[in-house]
Design a protein with these regions (language model features):
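Metallo-beta-lactamase
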Residues: 2-3, 11-73, 91-106, 109-110, 209-232, 239-241, ...
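Aromatic/hydrophobic pocket-lining residues that form the small-molecule binding cavity
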Residues: 112, 297, 375
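Active-site HxH/HxHxD metal-binding segment of metal-dependent hydrolases
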Residues: 3, 13, 107-110, 115-241, ...
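Conserved beta-strand hairpin/beta-sheet module of binuclear metal-dependent hydrolase folds
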Residues: 60-121, 125, 168, 261-278
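Short hydrophobic/aromatic-enriched beta-strand-loop microsegments
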Residues: 150-156, 271-273, 331, 367
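Histidine-centered divalent metal-coordination motifs
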Residues: 130-138, 156, 253-255, 259, ...
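C-terminal regulatory/interaction regions
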Residues: 28-52, 56-57, 340-403
């Protein structure tokens, strides 16, 4: 068993090898599921490849205690730009809670069982699953833990995924459909991607090959993408006791609307999920139903920056780090710079489409639907602030300066 425990000391002790350096915390790449786009439009494409970011590192099999009663394990994930997801194990007298139990599917489940064994636990020891937000690398194992260990599922109250069958009758047992109905699950995903983008045009969606793999995996895409149904939904400010600590729920919309962080005010520990990562920035999607997801993200980041006496931040990808305030402020500054790039481009694009502005913000190799989505989120933020006007021409959104 490879389990590294902290030495004797206070609740704020931790292994220094687990903490990101300031240099790592000052670099940026864009974290987004199924896409990892670089931001700068004028970066030299011939430059030598950079060392992979810490979030891109392959999953380690080692289990490390990062704070008393909190173990960090890593599960491999097969998403471009990401090498692992941190699955935290929170120990207490009842057994353990796990945070973000990896991707759906047998491979990830096997790795989760292995990491629990390395920590000295089995699946039946899991009494609670915390899912920080509605992306598959975070909720994948939740339903299986619920079924096999009777584990409670904790999310923010707004938790919802694209795999939800939104037009199901309220009286239907959606949990059973999640587990047993590949047809319903695939139909929900196909409906989601069949909708036109809010800035015009058809969405690419998953390839037929991807959909076929999902149908074949485990015999059912329904079981692979079983959507967690929270048994303990939290609201902002609510407390929950895990790992002998009282955690405060913090609703942190931005990366997703349903994103949840947990804060231990007594010992200054923050589980940040994908909201604040040590060296890459989370994707802010223009597909979100909210009018201005970037503004929500800014507000959530400011809340992170205001948390007093943080001793350690525990992200979903990459290494734990100390300067949560500085990192949150740096991410805000980064997006403000992206907004300035758009402002500077407006005179040259007085009636620009989302695709036109995307080409200014992103490198050519990153052009595509995901880059357009984040560009749209930034344009809508400027429109909500009264700096741009949007109109549609033949179904395509165009942006012009006010006045």
């Amino acid at each position: 068993m490879r389990l590294t425990r902290l030495g004797s000391g206070s609740m704020t002790g931790r292994a220094t090898t687990e903490v990101a350096t300031p240099a790592e915390a000052g670099t940026f790449m864009q974290h987004q599921h199924d896409h990892h786009a670089a931001h700068s439009g004028n970066t030299d494409e011939s430059a030598a490849p950079r060392k992979p970011k810490q979030e891109q590192e392959d999953a380690s099999t080692e289990v490390t205690e990062v704070a008393p009663g909190i173990l960090r394990t890593q599960l491999p994930i097969s998403m471009p730009g990401l090498g692992h997801v941190n699955c935290y194990v929170l120990e207490d007298e009842r057994g353990i809670a796990v945070v973000d139990p990896g991707l759906p599917g047998e491979d990830s489940w096997g790795h989760l069982v292995d990491r629990l064994a390395r920590a000295g636990y089995v699946v039946d020891d899991v009494h609670t699953v915390v899912v920080t937000h509605s992306h598959p690398d975070h909720f994948g194992g939740a339903m299986r833990l619920h079924h096999e260990a009777a584990a409670e599922i904790v999310t923010h109250e707004s938790f919802r995924t694209i795999f939800d069958t939104s037009d199901l009758d309220d009286h239907e047992d959606s949990e059973e459909l999640d587990v047993n109905s590949a047809d319903d699950r695939n139909a929900a995903m196909e409906r989601y991607f069949a909708k036109p983008s809010p800035w015009g045009g058809r969405r690419a969606g998953p390839s037929p090959e991807f959909m076929e793999r999902m149908r074949k995996a485990d015999g059912s895409a329904g079981s692979i993408f079983a959507t967690p149904r929270p048994t303990q939904p939290l609201v902002d400010g609510q407390t929950i006791k895990l790992a002998r600590r009282e955690w405060v729920a913090m609703h942190t919309p931005g990366h997703t609307y349903d994103h949840l962080c947990l804060y231990d005010p007594e010992f200054g520990v923050v589980l940040t999920g994908d909201h604040v990562l040590p060296s890459i920035t989370p994707h802010i999607s223009g597909m979100a139903p909210e009018a201005d997801p970037l503004d929500l993200f800014f507000g959530s980041l400011r809340r992170m920056a205001e948390i007093p006496d943080v001793t350690i931040a525990l992200p979903a990808h990459g290494h734990p780090f100390r300067d949560l305030r500085g990192r949150a402020e740096h991410i805000i500054e980064h997006h403000e710079e992206r907004l300035d790039v758009i402002r500077d481009a407006v005179p040259d694009l007085p009636n620009g489409t989302v695709a036109a502005f995307m080409r200014v913000l992103f490198r050519e190799r990153s052009w595509g639907e995901m880059a357009e989505s984040e560009t749209y989120a930034h344009l809508e933020h400027l429109r909500e602030r009264g700096e741009l006007v949007r109109h549609f021409d033949e179904g395509m959104a165009h942006y012009t300066p006010v006045g």
